[in-house]
Structure formats: structure tokens, C-alpha cells
Amino acid sequence: MKKVIVALGVLAFANVLMATDVKALVKGCAACHGVKFEKKALGKSKIVNMMSEKEIEEDLMAFKSGANKNPVMTAQAKKLSDEDIKALAKYIPTLK
């Protein structure tokens, strides 16, 4: 029983360490999109905090794959893991 408890503790701690630091990720976005994602980047983009979680995730995945043609966003999205993208998509709509 003791081994099971120790193993569960290790797994829980490892999960915390692997969790995406969303606040660190959004710092790189603020210059163009605003701290609360309230701006149109370069006067062109959608206002991201008005988008749904699903829309944000789909757009970031499309930028990452190159399906959305925008060299700046494609370069940024390629740096993100799928987990990072899901975390951002979940977090950004909370900034309204």
C-alpha cells in the first residue's frame, strides 16, 4: 500500500511539472494581441479574446500546420506543442 501511495504522489508531482505554463506563453503574444488579447494584431487579426476555445485551438493548429497563411503566426505556432495550444485556447477566453 505504501508503494502505491508513493507512486501516486510521484505521478501527481510529475503532472504538475509537465503542465503548461500558460501565463508564460501569453507574454510572447501580448506585443501584438494585447495583454488581454483585446487588440487586432497589426490591425488585421481577429480579436482573439472574442473567439471561442474551439476557434482559438483550430486557428492555432491551422497556423502550426501551415494551413493558415500568415508567416508571423505560423512561426509562433510551430514553437507550441499541441498541449500548449489547448492550454492557450482554454485560457484566452477567460481574459474578457
From Swiss-Prot:
Broad class of the protein's primary localization: periplasm
GO molecular function annotations of the record: electron transfer activity; heme binding; iron ion binding
GO cellular component annotations of the record: periplasmic space
SUPFAM superfamilies per UniProt: Cytochrome c
PTM section of the record: Binds 1 heme c group covalently per subunit.
Signal peptide segment: 1-19
Subcellular compartments: Periplasm
Keywords in alphabetical order: Electron transport, Heme, Iron, Metal-binding, Periplasm, Signal, Transport
Pfam families in the record: Cytochrom_C
Protein residues bound to heme c: 29, 32-33, 73
Its job: Natural electron acceptor for a formate dehydrogenase.
Similarity remark: Belongs to the cytochrome c family.
Protein name, per record: Cytochrome c-553
Species the sequence originates in: Helicobacter pylori (strain J99 / ATCC 700824) (Campylobacter pylori J99)
